[in-house]
Curated annotation (Swiss-Prot):
Gene name tied to this protein: glmM
Keywords, comma-separated and alphabetical: Isomerase, Magnesium, Metal-binding, Phosphoprotein
Residues at which Mg(2+) binds: 100, 241, 243, 245
Originating organism: Clostridium kluyveri (strain ATCC 8527 / DSM 555 / NBRC 12016 / NCIMB 10680 / K1)
PANTHER family: PHOSPHOGLUCOMUTASE (ALPHA-D-GLUCOSE-1,6-BISPHOSPHATE-DEPENDENT), PHOSPHOHEXOSE MUTASE
Keyword Isomerase among record annotations: yes
Catalysed reactions listed for this entry: alpha-D-glucosamine 1-phosphate = D-glucosamine 6-phosphate
Keyword Metal-binding assigned: yes
Family classification: Belongs to the phosphohexose mutase family.
The protein's name in its UniProt record: Phosphoglucosamine mutase
Catalytic residues of the enzyme: 100
Enzyme Commission designation: 5.4.2.10
GO molecular function, one term: magnesium ion binding
Amino acid sequence: MHRMFGTDGVRGIANKELTPELAYKLGKAGAYVLTGRCHKPKILVGMDTRISGDMLENALVSGILSIGAEAICVGIVPTPAVAYLTRKYNADAGVVISASHNPVEYNGIKFFNGKGYKLSDELEDKIQYVIESNFKDVSIPIGSKVGRKIMETGEARKAYIEFAKSTIDTDLKDLKVVLDCANGASYVTSVKAFQELGAKVKVINNEPDGININHNCGSTHPENLMKTVVEEGYDMGLAFDGDADRCLAIDEKGNLINGDFIMAIIAKHLKNQGKLYKNVVVSTVMSNVGFDIALKEEGINTIKTQVGDRYVLEEMRKEGYKLGGEQSGHIIMLDYNTTGDGLITALQIACIVKKSGRKLSDIASMMKNLPQTLVNAKVPDDKKKIYMEDEEIVLKIKEIERKLHGCGRVLIRPSGTEPLVRVMLEGEEQGEIDKMAHNLAELIEVKLN
């Protein structure tokens, strides 16, 4: 069975791969699977600012109503707001229509369970099975048993803003902040939260027209934000992506503060307050070695997962850890929300700067990124996972690890989509690791071709 669901719901080019017909089926099957035998189940629906959002929302909601469920439509809100509001409204499930940081032609449909967590693979497979079996044995309500659509846009947005503000214990008066909303879902919520907390706020890229989401702006294109912060003398910049589940920061000197730095800063702050469970942070294998070194010096341990925020969250829930995330700015704080939350991340950073009275560049200096290099080895698809079976390659990796003597690492990852093996090295000397990475990639190509 070809899986309909990827790592972040069902995604594709809107009206071509993710069609209104598919959205209708997902709404109908999702409502059926996720609400069980509830008398009048409720499903909360939110979306980002893409032009295709209205088309897909109408189709999705039709599917939900056709099964007898109520659809609570909260309009344009961040993905983490849907996770929070699903809990607040005691909904049986939540759905967000968004393709996150991807270009405008893409869209996606992602489900949350009643507790605000992304669905397990098993539940996603059940939804797919119901669709592929053409809704066999699914009873269709008529008359008064058909579902209703309930509009909750203003109140729901306000509730999320109040919730986000409640996660910090200080105002932000006298703090000068530039927000880059990526012409996306945070264009109201983030701005209002910072303004209501008293910050002096300049906003860029907060005029969504349905087409300009993520276009040369937001967390994937922070160059304009960096320039604005420096030229206009702001304390910091904060960049969100299209659905605002991630956030990156810019210090007062215009330096990018990525997710590794943000996790390190928040981890140290939480540890100092005695709030970092077991003094552990969960990150992915892509986090820089400098992140591990910085946290080790603070008496904080790091646990690594494979790439993807769902794997970070899995590890956190399994062991009860409270802080985790990715270099890309997906930061999960389970004391507050069940998914990466850009606004909560932004508020934590602003709160730490305000309470410390220090510059963000000074706070971020607790960590130094080690130089990093990435070289692709071209390898046939059927051979790219067997590199560890070759003795010469294994010996070469061990030799490089010895040369790095604990101040660097070798990470080798077969590409999931291309005939490539990615060779990533980190170490203290850029020239040295460039040479070692190229030599290793060449050896992998020779031995596996």
